[in-house]
Structure formats: C-alpha cells, structure tokens
Amino acid sequence: MYILGDIGNTETKIWLVSKKNKIIKKINFSSKEITNNKLSIILKKNNFKFKYVKKILFCSVVPQTFNLIKKFLSKKTNRNCYEVKNLNLKSLIKVKVDYKQVGSDRITNAISLMNGKNNFIILDFGTATTFDVLIQNTYYGGIIAPGVKLSL
C-alpha cells in the first residue's frame, strides 16, 4: 500500500492507496496548528493502518507541516517520506519557468494530465486559485489569484 498526501495552506488530504491504485481510505483535516498528537488522534480515529505501507509521497506548499507529517509517518512506517519537488522530475516533465518558484501541487497537477497529445489549462480551486499551462508535456507556468472563499 501507499500513502499519498497533499498539504495545502488550509487543508491536508491523505489517501491510503492499494498497489492496484484503489483508494482505500481518504482523510481531510485542517493544515493549521497540526501537532504529532493531533495527527495521531486523526489517524487512529480513521483506523489508519501503517503495517503494509511501502511508499509515502506528498506534495506540499507548507514545509513545516510536511516536515512534521514526514517525521511522524516515517517513524510509524519505518519508510522514507518524499515530497514531489525533492524528486528528480526533469526526465518526466519539462518546466519552462524557475522550478524553485512553482509549488509541488502545481507540478503534480501538470504531471497528472500529461499524455503527449493534448494541451491543458489547469485550474485548481484551493486557498488560492491557480491557472497553469501544459503544452505537449511541457509546463509553462501560470498565475495565482485569491481563492474563491477569499474573493467572496
């Protein structure tokens, strides 16, 4: 099994996924003020099993929260926990902007749509609304605007 996660400014989502890519469990919780104790309670309450976890991968725009979750999950599973931007993705996707300036959530969105044939304008409605451009497996960047809730 795999643990996949998305740590945003407002919300963190964690999925437990089978080797056949079936979502077994999904948990959402606030990214604000997360502690080891709160994380432990959330995962116990959701009957999260660590025994069979083989790999852990996150995209995160909140480094402090990722570091806390990384240490917690690495300890519980005895596995390394990786962040998408820390992986060498140059052979997977071409990025035409400063890679350091792009959030891993935006890179992950682009990778998820790559098919070599189609071009995409990628919209993501989170705390911020992002608009990104993917042309034939090349990420050209985009813009960030206030999220829907902030705009109301």
Locate the predicted segments by residue.
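Gly/Thr-rich phosphate-binding beta-strand-loop-beta motif of the actin/hexokinase/Hsp70
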Residues: 1-24, 113, 117-137
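Conserved phosphate-binding loops in N-terminal lobes of ATP-dependent enzymes
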Residues: 2-80
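Gly/Ser/Thr-rich beta-alpha loop segments that engage phosphate groups in nucleotides
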Residues: 10, 105, 128, 143-144, ...
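Glycine-rich phosphate-binding loop plus the immediately following alpha-helix
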Residues: 31-35, 114-116, 141-152
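Short, charged, surface-exposed secondary-structure boundary motifs
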Residues: 36-40, 91-95, 151-152
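Short beta-strand-loop/turn "lid" adjacent to the catalytic site in phosphate-handling enzymes
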Residues: 50-102, 135-148
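A general structural signal for well-ordered alpha-helical segments in protein cores
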Residues: 66, 106-110, 152
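Conserved phosphate-binding catalytic cores of ATP/NTP-utilizing and phosphoryl-transfer enzymes
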Residues: 91-120
